[in-house]
């Protein structure tokens, strides 16, 4: 699978001559078709396997007590998720833009995410500045990007909260695994900030959190396909997010300082989308 740097090099070569552009355009189209075909061919037998498992369970309920039987379901669900995300990544640059009022659009996303964490201790701070643009955008794909970033922030603060709860006699910093102020009562308060504003001719959207942060050695690779440092996940969420933002002519960047105190925001993802 091509990485983002591969695509950049291909586009540089395509700019050299019309002949190279035509040849590489056909190559990229064939590459997209191959991935779509492979995903389709795998998905069909996978669906059949899942149906067979359900039939076995219905006629032989005792199999539910077999060790690792439930792992079969988990593995199948993971493969289905992988195929769905692979297909989404393959089509990440294909947009269906429509007129989007970003004030309304972002407030809906903010409310949707806030309702999903209502039973947690997470403090969610949303700041949507006035005079955001109304402009063409693929709102469905942008929604996926923003909810993915917010979901990652939620995971990061919950990991940090869990790490701190395991050390009730000290305040902690999970990335460095160092513990500060021994003997002091733990006061970790998980926070996620969602901020959108207009700056010159750009729409800027940021998602920040005071979770466990991202190790410096991982920052350069988190946007590469299939790279993940989570116990679960396919490693396609961030690459797909960047691909969608770049298809809008924008950028998606990250800044993280995992060794900051827990009261400070450690990781920020920033989307910059040009306003036509």
What is each residue range found by the language model?
Residues 1-30:
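Conserved signal-transmission helix
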Residues 250, 254-257:
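Conserved glycine-rich
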Residues 214-225:
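Short conserved segment of the HATPase_c
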Residues 245-246:
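Detector for a conserved hydrophobic position within an alpha-helical segment of the HATPase_c
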Residues 2, 66-116:
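Conserved DHp (HisKA) dimerization/phosphotransfer helix of two-component histidine kinases, i.e.
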Residues 237, 241:
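Short alpha-helical Gxxx[C/S/T] motif in the catalytic ATP-binding
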Residues 164-201:
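Short beta-strand/loop element within the Bergerat-fold HATPase_c
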Residues 118, 123-133:
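Conserved catalytic submotifs in the C-terminal HATPase_c
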């Amino acid at each position: 699978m091509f990485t983002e740097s591969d695509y950049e090099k291909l586009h540089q070569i395509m700019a050299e001559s019309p002949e190279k552009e035509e040849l590489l355009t056909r190559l990229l189209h064939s590459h997209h078709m191959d991935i779509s075909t492979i995903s389709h061919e795998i998905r069909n037998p996978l669906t059949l396997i899942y149906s067979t498992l359900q039939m076995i369970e219905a006629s032989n309920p005792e199999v539910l007590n077999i060790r690792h039987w439930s792992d079969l379901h988990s593995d199948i669900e993971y493969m289905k998720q992988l195929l769905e995300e692979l297909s989404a990544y393959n089509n990440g640059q294909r947009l269906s833009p429509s007129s989007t009022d970003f004030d309304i659009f972002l407030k809906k996303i903010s409310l949707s995410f806030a309702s999903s964490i209502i039973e947690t201790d997470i403090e969610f701070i949303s700041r949507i500045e006035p005079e955001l643009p109304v402009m063409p955008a693929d709102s469905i794909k942008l929604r996926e990007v923003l909810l993915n970033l917010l979901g990652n922030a939620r995971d990061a603060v919950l990991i940090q909260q869990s790490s701190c709860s395991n050390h009730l006699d000290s305040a902690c910093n999970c990335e460095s695994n160092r513990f500060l102020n021994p003997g002091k009562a733990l006061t970790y308060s998980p926070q996620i900030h969602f901020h959108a504003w207009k700056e010159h001719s750009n729409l800027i959207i940021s998602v920040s959190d005071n979770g466990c942060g991202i190790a410096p050695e991982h920052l350069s690779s988190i946007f590469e396909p299939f790279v993940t440092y989570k116990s679960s996940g396919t490693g396609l969420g961030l690459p797909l997010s960047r691909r969608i933002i770049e298809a809008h002519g924008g950028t998606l960047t990250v800044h993280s300082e995992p060794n900051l105190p827990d009261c400070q925001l450690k990781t920020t993802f920033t989307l910059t989308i040009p306003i036509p």
